[in-house]
Amino acid sequence: MENNAHLMARYASACQVHGLVPIVEPDIDVINGSHSLDKATQVSTQILSVFFKVLQDYGVYLEGIVLKTSMAVAGKKASQPSLPQDVAKATLLALSRSVPPAVPGVAFLSGGQTEAQVRKPFHHHQRRNGLSSGGLF
């Protein structure tokens, strides 16, 4: 976990020195396994917290990055699959607990999900909350 964070921090620093906007990606495998949605949220929060601490330790200008990450979802072999509204809530919770407000953008990976599966949490969140999401969706 920390090795990836250090590599990404060095990459981000080098990009910024040369006037580029780095797209940084923490190493979070959320789709494989039998973990619950709650466990995915907890692990995502922990990894993102460590990730951003390392970026800050390296002096990365957080206002000049894009975070590329996965949504918090239960594992493929979980006893209870994740509902779209729960994925939206869990993902927003993990991000709001760990991503500094200075980060201007988040790009989501599919995490092995289909396009329809990826879109459902976003659509659910926007139907329920309008376009407002604290800047995350």
Predicted features and spans:
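Non-transmembrane, interaction-prone segments in cytosolic or luminal domains
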Residues: 3-7, 16, 87, 106-109
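Active-site capping/gating regions of soluble enzymes
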Residues: 32-137
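Substrate-engagement module of ASCE P-loop NTPases
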Residues: 7-15, 51-56
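Glycine-rich anion/phosphate-binding loops
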Residues: 1-11, 46
